[in-house]
Regions:
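Polysaccharide-binding and catalytic clefts of secreted carbohydrate-active enzymes
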Residues: 45, 116-182, 190-192, 197-198, ...
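Active-site-proximal helices and loops of the catalytic beta/alpha 8
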Residues: 1-11, 15, 25-34, 44-57, ...
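Aromatic- and acidic-residue-enriched segments that line the glycan-binding/catalytic groove
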Residues: 51-60, 96-142, 203-204
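Short coil/turn segments at secondary-structure boundaries
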Residues: 62-68
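First exposed extracellular module after export/assembly in secreted or surface-exposed proteins
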Residues: 22, 79, 109-117, 131, ...
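Substrate-binding cleft of carbohydrate-active enzyme catalytic domains
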Residues: 39, 69-112
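Soluble non-cytosolic domains of exported or imported proteins
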Residues: 4, 17-27, 68, 72, ...
Length: 234
C-alpha cells in the first residue's frame, strides 16, 4: 500500500453469520458500505465438507460454492464492490486442510491442470503424532518434515516446504485473484508455518494487500513481518 494509506477495512462477517454474510446480502449494501470502507474482508469462501461451515476447515480450493452463496453470487458481489471502489480481501486458510477420512484430499482442475494435495504433504508430527500413528496403521507415508509452527488438531497441517504444497497454494491464490476478483489476502493462523512462504505466495499471486493473523507481542509480530520480507502486514 502507499505510505500513510488512509483506507478502512470492514470485517464483513462474524461467527456463524450465515444469513447476514450471504454474498447477495452484502452486495445489496454496496452503496452504503462504499461511503465508509475501502476494503471488505470476507470468510474463506471455498466449499467445505460440512455445508454449515464458516470455512476454516477448507476442503475444496477451486469450488467456491459455500455456506454463504454460490460462486456466481460471490463473483457478482466482488465485481459490484469493485465498481463502487471497494476491494475484497479473501481469507486464505492454508496452514491446514481438511480431509475425507485421515488422508484423502480432493483432486481439482483449473485452467486445464489438476491439483491435489497428498499424504506426503502432511507434516510428520501432525496432531501431536496421532496422524503418524494412523499412517503407520494404514501403510501411508507422511512428509519427513516437522511442522514449522504451531499444530492445529482436527485438520491436517501442511508442509509448506513441499514443492507440491507450494504449487497447489500458488495456483489457488492465482485463482482467487484472476478468476474470482479478490485483490488481497488475510492469512489465517500464520503462526503455523514460516512467514517466508507468505512472501513467496504473495509474489506469485501479485496481490495488492496482505495481512497475517499474528496476535502477539510487538516483537513476535515484528519478527513475523520480517520473515515475510515485509511483504505482509500483521
Amino acid at each position: 500500500w502507499p505510505a500513510n494509506y488512509g483506507g478502512v477495512m470492514l470485517q464483513g462477517f462474524y461467527w456463524d453469520s450465515f444469513s447476514d454474510t450471504r454474498w447477495t446480502k452484502l452486495e445489496a449494501q454496496a452503496d452504503e458500505l462504499s461511503q465508509y470502507f475501502s476494503l471488505i474482508w470476507v470468510p474463506q469462501s471455498g466449499k467445505c465438507l460440512n455445508s454449515g461451515s464458516m470455512g476454516y476447515d477448507p476442503y475444496y480450493y477451486f469450488d467456491q460454492n459455500s455456506a454463504f452463496g454460490t460462486a456466481t453470487e460471490l463473483k457478482s458481489m466482488i465485481k459490484t464492490f469493485k465498481s463502487k471502489g471497494i476491494g475484497t480481501i479473501a481469507d486464505v486458510v492454508v496452514n491446514l486442510h481438511n480431509t475425507d477420512g485421515w488422508f484423502t484430499f480432493p483432486a481439482e482442475t483449473w485452467q486445464g491442470a489438476t491439483y491435489q494435495l497428498l499424504s506426503t504433504d502432511i507434516v510428520l508430527n501432525d496432531d501431536g503424532g496421532k496422524t503418524l500413528t494412523q499412517a503407520t496403521t494404514d501403510g501411508v507415508s507422511l512428509s519427513a518434515n516437522y511442522d514449522e509452527g504451531q499444530d492445529w488438531n482436527g485438520c491436517r497441517d501442511l508442509d509448506h516446504k513441499s514443492a507440491n504444497v507450494q504449487t497447489v497454494v500458488k495456483a489457488y491464490e492465482r485463482f482467487l485473484v484472476k478468476e474470482m476478483g479478490y485483490i488481497g489476502f488475510r492469512y489465517d493462523m500464520v503462526k503455523g508455518f514460516s512467514g517466508s512462504h507468505v512472501a513467496d505466495y504473495n509474489d506469485a499471486a501479485g496481490i495488492e494487500y496482505s495481512v497475517g493473523e499474528c496476535w502477539d507481542g510487538t516483537g513476535t509480530i515484528r519478527n513475523w513481518i520480517d520473515a515475510t520480507s515485509k511483504k505482509s502486514a500483521a
